[in-house]
From Swiss-Prot:
The keyword RNA-binding does not apply. HAMAP family: MraZ. Keywords: Cytoplasm, DNA-binding, Repeat, Transcription, Transcription regulation. This is Transcriptional regulator MraZ. It comes from the Bacteria. Forms oligomers. The keyword Hydrolase does not apply. It is found in: Cytoplasm, Nucleoid. It comes from Azotobacter vinelandii (strain DJ / ATCC BAA-1303). SUPFAM superfamilies: AbrB/MazE/MraZ-like. The gene is mraZ. Belongs to the MraZ family.
Length: 152
C-alpha cells in the first residue's frame, strides 16, 4: 500500500526518481511496470502498478458502452494511459503531454493513495490540500455516513 506525500523533482527530461521506500514493493508487485494517466477529476496524474491498472481496465471494459459517460471516461483514462518502467536507478519518464495536463515543473508531489499514486504540481497540491482541510473543518456534518463512521 502506498501512503504519504513525497516531494519529488523532475529533471530536464521529465524524469522522476521513485522514492526508495516504494521501489521494493513496486518491483515485487509489478516488476517496476507502471501505468500513468490523467486524473479525470483533478489536475494531476495517476500512477498505477500494472496489476492495479489491469483491474481498472477490466472494470472499464464491463461498463455499458452505449452510454456517453462511459465512452468519455474510457477516452480520458485509457486514451491517455502510458506504460512506464522504473529504470535501474528507480526513475521513470513522464511524457510531455501528461506533464502539461498536470502543470508539472521541477517541483512536484507524489501522493500515495493506497493502490496508486497521484502526481501533482507542488503548488496545486498545497492549494488542494489546504482547501480540502478547510472544507472538512467547515462542514464536518456533510460527510457521507460511511466516512463519518470511519474510525481515525
Amino acid at each position: 500500500m502506498f501512503r504519504g506525500a513525497n516531494a519529488v523533482s523532475l529533471d530536464a527530461k521529465g524524469r522522476i526518481s521513485m522514492p526508495a521506500r516504494y521501489r521494493e514493493e513496486l518491483m515485487a508487485r509489478s516488476a517496476g511496470q507502471l501505468i500513468v494517466t490523467i486524473d479525470a477529476m483533478d489536475p494531476c496524474l495517476c500512477i498505477y502498478p500494472l496489476p492495479e491498472w489491469e483491474l481498472i481496465e477490466t472494470k472499464l471494459r464491463e461498463l455499458p458502452s452505449l452510454r456517453e459517460e462511459t465512452r468519455r471516461l474510457q477516452r480520458l483514462l485509457i486514451g491517455n494511459a502510458v506504460d512506464l518502467e522504473l529504470d535501474g536507478s528507480g526513475r521513470f519518464l513522464i511524457p510531455p503531454r501528461l506533464r502539461e495536463h498536470a502543470s508539472l515543473d521541477k517541483h512536484a508531489m507524489l501522493v500515495g493513495q493506497l493502490n496508486k499514486f497521484q502526481l501533482w504540481n507542488e503548488d496545486a497540491w498545497i492549494a488542494i490540500a489546504n482547501a480540502d482541510l478547510a472544507a472538512i473543518k467547515q462542514q464536518p456534518g456533510d460527510l457521507p455516513g460511511e466516512l463519518r463512521d470511519l474510525i481515525l
